[in-house]
Amino acid sequence: MAQGRERDEGPHSAGGASLSVRWVQGFPKQNVHFVNDNTICYPCGNYVIFINIETKKKTVLQCSNGIVGVMATNIPCEVVAFSDRKLKPLIYVYSFPGLTRRTKLKGNILLDYTLLSFSYCGTYLASYSSLPEFELALWNWESSIILCKKSQPGMDVNQMSFNPMNWRQLCLSSPSTVSVWTIERSNQEHCFRARSVKLPLEDGSFFNETDVVFPQSLPKDLIYGPVLPLSAIAGLVGKEAETFRPKDDLYPLLHPTMHCWTPTSDLYIGCEEGHLLMINGDTLQVTVLNKIEEESPLDRRNFISPVTLVYQKEGVLASGIDGFVYSFIIKDRSYMIEDFLEIERPVEHMTFSPNYTVLLIQTDKGSVYIYTFGKEPTLNKVLDACDGKFQAIDFITPGTQYFMTLTYSGEICVWWLEDCACVSKIYLNTLATVLACCPSSLSAAVGTEDGSVYFISVYDKESPQVVHKAFLSESSVQHVVYDQQGIFLLVGTAEGKVFIINANSSSSFQIIGFTEVAKDILQISTVSLLETDIVEVMVLSSLPEAGRSRLEMFTLPTLLPQVSTTFADERGRLKDEIIHKYLYELEHALSSAVLGFQSNQIYGFCSQVPYICSYLLPEEEHTGIYILKPYKKVQSRQYGPGLLYLSSHGLWLITIAKCGILCIRDVYTLETFAWCRSHSHQGHGIQSMRISMDGQNILVNGRDDGTLVYLKWKRFGGHLASEILDYYQKLLISLSSAMDKENHYLSTTPKVSVDLGSDSEHTKQKASTDLSQDELVLTDVKKEIPWIQQKSQEAIKKEVNLFSKKRKEIKQGIKSLSKTILNMMEENDKLENIAKLDQQEFGLDLEELERLHDESQEEVAKMIKDVEMHNLAKSYLAELIKEECWNSMAVKGRALKCFHIPCVVENFPMKARTVEELKELERVLQQKKIEAECLKLRKEIVEAQSGVKLIKQRHEEDDEEEEEEDKTVKYSNLPNYLLGSLSTDFGVDTSLLSSQLELHSREEKINQIILLKDIIYKVKTVFNNEFDAAYKQKEFEIARVKERNVRIREIILDLELEEAVWQPEFEDCEKPERTLVVQDEEITAHKHIKPWHKAKELIVNHEKEHWLLIQDASTRLRALMDMMGGVLEVKKEDILRMVIPQPAFMAKPDAVWTEEERKQFKDYEKKVKELNEERDKYRKSLEAELKKLQNSIQESTQAFDEHLKRLFERRVKAEMVTNQEELKISNLAFSLLLDEELSSREKFLNNYLTRKQHEKSQTSEAVRKSREDLDVCKEHYDNLLAEDKVMDRSFKKEFSEIPGHQVDILYKLFKRRPRISKQKTHSETTSVVPFGELPGSGKLNKDAFAQLMKAMDELDNISNMPEGLDPLVWNHFCMTRRAKVENEQKVKQKAADLLEMATFLQKRVEEEEKVQQEIERVFHELILLQEEKVRFQLNLTIQILLKQGQVELENFQLVLEYSDAILINKNIIEDLNSVIRTQGQKKVASMMESKDVHKRILQIEWEHKKMEMEREDLNQKAWDIQMLFFSRDRQKYLNEPNYEALISIQIGIMEQTIAVLDKMHKKNVENCKKLLKKLGKFSNQKDIANYALSCNLREELVAVSERKDICNAMGSKLTCEKIVKERYENMMQQQKLTNISKQQAEQISILQTEVERLRMKTFPALVQM
């Protein structure tokens, strides 16, 4: 086992003893990697665990800075890299198998690395970090430097891999994107180039994307202006405009899940939607592979999306969530799926070994399988993961060979302590919480969430079994603790009960009783010494409200199991006075506390402050709560809440905390003598620990990192070991008899039938639970009752038996009450529905009745609240509508109807103009007035300059001036057809409106809109005034009709006609305020009348009746009513109702009448006749009056209807004017909007141009730098090549002193090179490995060079020396040859670097050209946009009024093409035609009148010809006399009306040109200065080099002279002279050519200057923008 060499020196001073990590058990949460063909590794907590798949041997590497982050391995170099999780994390690179640190990489990442990946060949490591940098970095991990990095904010990546065949390609994929990054290198410079893959749509089809920046397919609109891209319409001008797409244009794409590379540098991508994609690595072209469906599809499985992919020959291996591995056989563009392997769990990761003979399969639980090709068995489980992290651990007594672990799902494992091999497993199939092993027997207790305790027998380690189950309560078990001698088992539950159970299996784990403590139990501590017969128990609980902790202590005698009935009551509760229960409180909160073995001392770990305190218990007894004060306080030097444990002999205090450090302290001094950092604070430290009885074995369990660490002592001896070993021996001797007895009982105890499961059954059950979690298995089992409820029921039974008589009496009373209630229910059934009570009212359950009553009250209150809220919402909505549509209206909307015809006229509802609108209108009006005054002043100034004409005009007659003024006014007011509306018909002033042909600027259009809105407001106001007048007139007419109807009703009543009286009324549309008032008849609900209202109505009715009685008693009034109908004077209207009473004698026959009576009868008839005549006369007068009144009503109402019809026409015209003005406003608003879009587009193009220019400067700088580097490298290459040639040519000169034949032999040996034997790979391996031999890299080149040097050592051996050669000469020859070989290698390497740099330069040049093309394209787009903008500003949209039926077009094509069409008024054409016709008629008449017209014409033509000839003669004479030269400037001066403005413009252009030339000149001067400075430095360098060369030249001349003497002496001619002569001739020729090129360059520069001067002279106004 090896650990990291760097470990933080903690703040603890360890003494002579120290701890070390023996092994670590944990299961992978990240992907498992191969280090070599036989070793895999994975991170777990603070460690990296290496496993040999053949021997299953583990090796551990510990991270010095906490939890291991991400990890990657490099198989060729056998190194592993991982990051830590601290702030500003580091990357560590370790070699394997030595586990020595190679390097430490430090970047600028703030939080965490998320991905690491090694290149398959070379020393490159790629790292990726997410938030907040989103940075991809490339490292040279051997030299610990970052080669290049790039940040892309917002891009989250979940997989990263290098191309196995090309280290320059890197693929990054996420659920939404796939990108291929290319690494480009030039000498020592590296850079990233990213390209994104265009993914298909979800259905596998491809979407044709258009260019967002420069769209080419936009339609052309000749009427409404240019059509711009969507980004310009949206107003985007930044980078977001380059990728902007509206929501309607966004389509869901495929979601990649995994990718893998192929030997052809292609990519296979698996998607969530089930598609398999193939991407070309060079072109990034995406191909959707077609799936070939089999005839018999796979049953009971539905493979949707691959979770992981690995490449194999002719296809890929993929896995999903169904636990199967599939083989994808790919041919061309289709693939077929076949079953490859079945795994018990869903597969999360797969990878091949480097030799491709082993396939590693990792499940979601963390288990690791190895599939070996061509061997039996093919599938082998390397790592069997547990079902979740370890919840609890404990040693099996005595703690030297085995230990147990428990997971939350109920999985119990027995492990071999030496190498952590799993011996056996058992599943409880329930949620477990705690575990404890019994010191006095081979058994263990497991607490569960449902309140049960399972007792496990581990007598047979390979097959543990449940021997007993105790269902204590329905509250979960949180603590299970054995005392030191294994007498009692104490179980703490969440509800605050501590159960005491007999720990002996022979007693069937008898439950003795329980005691109640505080609910939040933190720890239970016991002390059971060998020399005493009691067990002291302490329970620690927290009081979060008070910020304190409570200690509750009680004593249990060892004889308690025999006398348990006397210690507990009938319900099982232990009596506090018998167990001597005492309460203590501490003034501060503790996270843990243990009871010391001696001196009644307690040790506590403070949770708020980093201190460990000891407390002394009082010796005297006390009642109530006793406050403990700290006796000793020591700083723990551990942060976070911690736990305390005591060793078996009670002299070691072991502390663990959130920081992950375990400390062993002396119990007396509380000082640390041993410590170990086994976990880290990133994983929330240590959850629990266990120490064996002999103190030599320590198990530490992490809280969140899922690691179990086994610690051993490095040095364990002396007094430290003797104390605990002595106590261990005594304890074993004391427990030996009890252990033998209990173990024998456990060996004979049968297994309890509890629903347990084996490994395979548990796996299947787990899988079925995962697949369908909603299925419920119903079993007909009787519900089990907890022990505490059983005791309660037994106590209740005893109480029932004790009070049986009283119970009978109560039963009889209940029976009588039930009979009474039954009678009441029968009576209730006979009542009516209103009087009936509900069935629940007769229930005797008062609590139920109260509950139902409360529910009904709550329901009523809820309904009331809902109704109130509903009413409130409706009221609020009504108030909003009223405020918006009524109160805010300055002019309320209303209608006006005619009396007789169906005609309705509505007014214009209008809101009051705001203060801002009025201020804006005032500003525009003031501006218009100022402009008018300015225009008037300008006209006066221009007229004053004209001089004489102005004086003549002032002296003209007054009539002509008035006519001209009228004409001017008439001209200034535009006609309606040019104004575009009929607003002048309403008397609205339109003189301030600008002409529609002059609205070019944005401000003019805005001002025009404001004025048009004001015109609309005025038009509406004018009409509303007319409407109000008509409304008042109708009110007057209705009042007058109502007044006349009074008389009409009287006449009808007098005439006793049945004719109805027509009474006009205002309708609701005419008086809309009625809608806001709710009438009583509109309310459909029953009106609720309050009691005091009812009482008031009764009083009013009583007073009315009393008044009527008083009126009946008045005889005078009654007499008046009987005599004259209640009136004192007879009116004329009463004639019609007047009746003359008949005499009384008329009842007699005529024969018996007397004369007097006959005379009275005649008088009667005369009166009747007169009355009838008067009645007829009055009736006729009434009828005439009635007809007259009705006619007057008819006439007045019809007159009003006619007026309203005219008002309706006025309303139509006003609406027409309003629509016309609003149409103009809409056109202006559209032009403003289009202007904004054009401005946005122009800003975006300018910003885009700025970015491209910046990019161009960067690319130009990169090209310049690359070209300089290439030149330097080429120079070095030329030097090396020249040195190589010199070494080759000067070989014979070096060995000129030896004979010629030996020189020839040595030259052949000098040219000879060793053959390097390539390692031949086996044919089987070559056929299996799909990637074959990976391409070379820098490391491989170094290895090849080292191998070449090794082979050169063999050639340099003395045995290869030719015969007769001096050994000194041989050694000199070997050194020369080795130098030649090294130089050749340098030349090859430099040639490769040169080719790479040339390629890099070519790419940079291509990028520069591409950017330049983009810039030119942007310039072209800007020019087109500016042209469009100018065209849009000039081509105005105007509104012209046309008369219907007067537009005639013979050619319909004129409507389509507006290039030559002019729209004019028809009246102008007609007037012109009439004038032409009149003049033509006059001309014909004059020609007919004059007979000699033709002669006169001929005469005039002759005279005209004569005069022309004379003019020619005179002109010729004038030309002969004087020739006058007239230049173009003078012509321009005479022809140009504003020559000074033209001159000023040209001066401005020339100034700009001069400024630009000055700027360019300064820039050229600066460049020349820089060049001169650079040349000066270069000259100094050359002087120094020339001085060095001159010195060398002297030495060489001396050597040459010596050699000449030698050669002359030997009589042989040297070839050096020939070489020197040739070099001299070449040098002279080169110098001559250099001079010629300089002269030509000077001539070219002079010609360029002349060309530039001529160009500026020809085009002086072309200034660069």
UniProtKB/Swiss-Prot annotation:
WD repeat extents? 108-149, 152-191, 250-290, 299-338, 342-381, 385-425, 427-469, 472-511, 680-721
InterPro entries from the UniProt entry: WD40/YVTN_repeat-like_dom_sf, WD40_repeat_dom_sf
**A single GO BP annotation from the record?**
nucleus organization
Query: Does the keyword field hold Heme?
Result: no
| Protein's cellular compartments | Cell projection, Cilium, Flagellum; Cytoplasm, Cytoskeleton, Flagellum axoneme; Cytoplasm, Cytoskeleton, Cilium axoneme
SUPFAM superfamilies from the entry? WD40 repeat-like
User: Cellular component terms, GO, for this chain's entry?
Assistant: 9+2 motile cilium; axoneme; extracellular region
Tissue-wise, where is it found?
A: Testis-specific.
Q: What is the effect of changing residue 347 to A?
A: In SPGF19; uncertain significance
Q: Does the keyword Transcription regulation apply?
A: no
Regions annotated as coiled coil: 812-869, 910-957, 1154-1207, 1378-1429
Q: What keyword terms does UniProt attach to this protein?
A: Cell projection, Cilium, Cilium biogenesis/degradation, Coiled coil, Cytoplasm, Cytoskeleton, Disease variant, Flagellum, Repeat, WD repeat
Query: According to the UniProt entry, which disease involves this protein?
Result: Spermatogenic failure 19: An infertility disorder caused by spermatogenesis defects and characterized by abnormally shaped spermatozoa in the semen of affected individuals. SPGF19 patients have spermatozoa with absent, short, coiled, bent, and/or irregular-caliber flagella, which impair sperm motility. Hydrocephalus, normal pressure, 1: An autosomal dominant neurologic disorder characterized by a slowly progressive gait disorder, urinary incontinence, progressive intellectual decline, and ventricular enlargement on brain imaging. Cerebrospinal fluid pressure tends to be in the high normal range.
Q: Family, per the entry?
A: Belongs to the CFAP43 family.
What's this protein's function?
Flagellar protein involved in sperm flagellum axoneme organization and function. Involved in the regulation of the beating frequency of motile cilia on the epithelial cells of the respiratory tract.
User: Would you tell me the protein name for this molecule?
Assistant: Cilia- and flagella-associated protein 43
